[in-house]
Amino acid sequence: MAEIKNYTLNFGPQHPAAHGVLRLVLELDGEVIQRADPHIGLLHRATEKLAESKTFIQSVPYMDRLDYVSMMVNEHGYVLAIEKLLGIDVPIRAKYIRVLFDEVTRVLNHLMWIGAHALDVGAMAVFLYAFREREDLMDVYEAVSGARMHAAYYRPGGVYRDLPDAMPQYKASKIRNTKALSKLNENRQGSLLDFIEDFFNRFPKCVDEYETLLTDNRIWKQRLVGIGVVSPERALQMGLTGAMLRGSGIEWDLRKKQPYEVYDQMDFDIPVGVNGDCYDRYLVRVEEMRQSTRIAKQCIEWLRKNPGPVMTDNHKVAPPSRVGMKSNMEELIHHFKLFTEGFHVPEGEAYAAVEHPKGEFGIYLVSDGANKPYRLKIRAPGYAHLSALDEMARGHMIADAVTIIGTQDIVFGEVDR
């Protein structure tokens, strides 16, 4: 009898479940995966090399475009590395604003993840619900920075500006009548902080909705339980971080273990899984959304009571005020120099890591004393996770490959960078 050979299948790069531009070369025995070989680099934009020809501040917008669903957290790692090299202090209010927006970004990321993951597995409704909530958070981004996605809001030494006192409101148009407008603008009457607080007061109920649809859903559990199991030892060996590591039962979160900004003053818990399968990672991320809500509420409470500066008073780094610029020639020259030549960073190297929604996002920065980085290395969490795909998918059905890609929460901007 003739021997049955394995056959090879190309999964992606234009597959809807490939999360962008992933090309998987699958070796199959019938419908069982024997080997999964990820091919990356289809979204490579040479970010690390581009940064070498840009001033330090000009590379901030590049960070937004790495993991383009967790924009501000990428910026955070980068500005922390610059601040380490410069040795400057950040005003306490700016630290709280950064932590607040890190958590807003974490929720943004997890909403995208739960919607896309559920859609891949076959649950349509969650995707629509998740995007309903994301819309409000995108409006928060827009109110504070003027952009819905690529905010470029963090700066070395603080943030671009303080939180606005008024929330932008919807205006009448062909598709929105006055009655619909009044309902949409109902919670936009106050400041940005009021709007964020209102969102996080409503949000736990929204998370309950997602859990009602998924957590005890028979089909959801059949598709996730026991799929892509990673043991705690193996998770550490493969360099997994974030929810991928915590799902395997290892309590590691940089916000607790190596606190930065004001996370050491925040009261929150680290959710940890037991079995290390896709279902545990799902539960960990859902609980992370609840913990982010707790942190955000603490930040809002503090920010209400404590006004103050949001940018360092070190004039080598901070641009002069608009008012000063229009009345003082020296300040105008200083502003011009700062945005053309940029500031010079002392010689040295620094590594700064933040707890990104996907794992540990690190920036290794080398300076030779010039106004541009000598070398910028980005440690993307998704890169290590994707390398574990082969091991996680072996022995599973081809349909489970989709579940495993979903649970890894991969975005190719940061993998290919």
Curated annotation (Swiss-Prot):
Enzyme class name: translocase
Alphabetized GO MF terms: NAD binding; NADH:ubiquinone reductase (non-electrogenic) activity; quinone binding
Reaction(s) catalysed (UniProt annotation): a quinone + NADH + 5 H(+)(in) = a quinol + NAD(+) + 4 H(+)(out)
Function summary: NDH-1 shuttles electrons from NADH, via FMN and iron-sulfur (Fe-S) centers, to quinones in the respiratory chain. The immediate electron acceptor for the enzyme in this species is believed to be ubiquinone. Couples the redox reaction to proton translocation (for every two electrons transferred, four hydrogen ions are translocated across the cytoplasmic membrane), and thus conserves the redox energy in a proton gradient.
PANTHER family: NADH DEHYDROGENASE [UBIQUINONE] IRON-SULFUR PROTEIN 2, MITOCHONDRIAL, NADH-UBIQUINONE OXIDOREDUCTASE 49 KDA SUBUNIT
Family per similarity comment: Belongs to the complex I 49 kDa subunit family.
Keywords: Cell inner membrane, Cell membrane, Membrane, NAD, Quinone, Translocase, Transport, Ubiquinone
Assembly, per entry: NDH-1 is composed of 14 different subunits. Subunits NuoB, C, D, E, F, and G constitute the peripheral sector of the complex.
EC number, UniProt record: 7.1.1.-
Superkingdom of the organism of origin: Bacteria
PROSITE patterns cross-referenced by the UniProt entry: COMPLEX1_49K
Matches recorded under InterPro entries: NADH_Q_OxRdtase_suD, NADH_UbQ_OxRdtase_49kDa_CS, NDH1_su_D/H, NiFe-Hase_large
Source species taxonomy: Bacteria, Pseudomonadati, Pseudomonadota, Betaproteobacteria, Burkholderiales
Name of the protein: NADH-quinone oxidoreductase subunit D
